[in-house]
């Protein structure tokens, strides 16, 4: 039996994988975020495309949290999209504890995504602001 060639075998893997963190209120933006990250030349790990069923409470929340923590740990960087929810804040803190680069992005209109600084972040009600001391 001979091995057939396939185009996928000639394509070099991306050098970086990023975890995309965002509030569930931006669930509807998950595919635009995935496209944005792919367009940057890196590979996204998007929990809302991997674990969207957790919103239906079909799986224990702590099971999904463990899965998210594992994916954050395996990713090279963490990119945050939109307002900071309490779970997103926890993912950022984890990434910083693991000495990962964290980048922040906001949405303008329906589909425009742009990078912002930590000083420009918007927090959901009751979420403590992020303070990052050094890398």
What is the predicted role of each segment?
Residues 1-135:
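Conserved catalytic or regulatory cores that recognize and/or transform ribose-phosphate-containing ligands
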């Amino acid at each position: 039996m001979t091995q057939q060639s396939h185009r996928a075998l000639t394509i070099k893997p991306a050098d970086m994988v990023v975890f995309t963190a965002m509030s569930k209120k931006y669930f509807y933006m998950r595919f635009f975020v995935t496209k944005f990250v792919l367009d940057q030349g890196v590979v996204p790990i998007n929990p809302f495309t991997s674990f969207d069923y957790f919103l239906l409470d079909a799986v224990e929340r702590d099971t999904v949290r463990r899965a998210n923590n594992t994916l954050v740990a395996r990713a090279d960087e963490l990119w945050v999209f939109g307002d900071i929810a309490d779970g997103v804040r926890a993912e950022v803190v984890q990434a910083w504890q693991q000495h990962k680069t964290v980048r922040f992005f906001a949405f303008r209109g329906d589909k425009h995504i742009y990078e912002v600084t930590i000083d420009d972040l918007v927090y959901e009600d009751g979420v403590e602001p992020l303070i990052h001391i050094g890398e």
